Amino acid sequence: MMKFLLILIFLASFSFSLTPEEEKQLLKDIAEIKTTLKAFIREADERFEQVDKRFEDVNRRFEDFNRRLNDLREDMNKRFELVDKRFIELREDMNKRFELVDQRFEQLYTFLWIITGIFTTLTASVIAFAWWDRRTIIRKTKEETFEEMEKELKPEKFRKIMNALREKAKTDKELEAILKKYGLL
């Protein structure tokens, strides 16, 4: 831009005829303009350098921010992985505990079956013992009763009773069946 102004001024000076003083004044003015332009360009360069530095600072800040953001993201990912591991461990621990509870229930169920079997066996044993005892006592009582009757009854009385029963059995079919059953007819 500065060159364009100089060329424009130079061309303008040829088209006009200037006196040597005017030419000197014009050259001074051009020199002042040139100096001013150089100062302006220097200031603009300094400002551009400052702007460049600011952009570099902003870029550095963005890079730092991005780095911190990446670090934060990596830290969050690590924490999420740790949380996932904890959940997996917790799930495995819960599964183990449920398996232990299931085993305990199975043991209790088996124990209840054993108790039921023992109770059933005891009940059956008591019933069988009561039945056996009753039969034994009844048989023994019958035998003792017959023996006592035989002792009380003399053989002669016993024969008379048996003869009376045999005669009654001729008319009573039920009594006849009973006597035959015991081999008394």
From Swiss-Prot:
Q: Which residues form a coiled coil?
A: none
Cellular compartments per GO CC:
plasma membrane
Tell me the keywords, alphabetical order: Cell membrane, Membrane, Transmembrane, Transmembrane helix
For this UniProt entry, what is the primary localization, expressed as one broad class? membrane
Which positions make up the signal peptide?
Answer: none
In the bilayer, the protein is annotated as: Multi-pass membrane protein
Give TM regions.
1-21, 111-131
Q: Can you say where in the cell this protein is located? A: Cell membrane
Q: Which Gene3D superfamilies match?
A: 3.90.20.10
The similarity annotation says:
To A.aeolicus aq_1900.
Which protein, by its recorded name, is this? Answer: Uncharacterized protein aq_1446
Q: Which organism is it from?
A: Aquifex aeolicus (strain VF5)
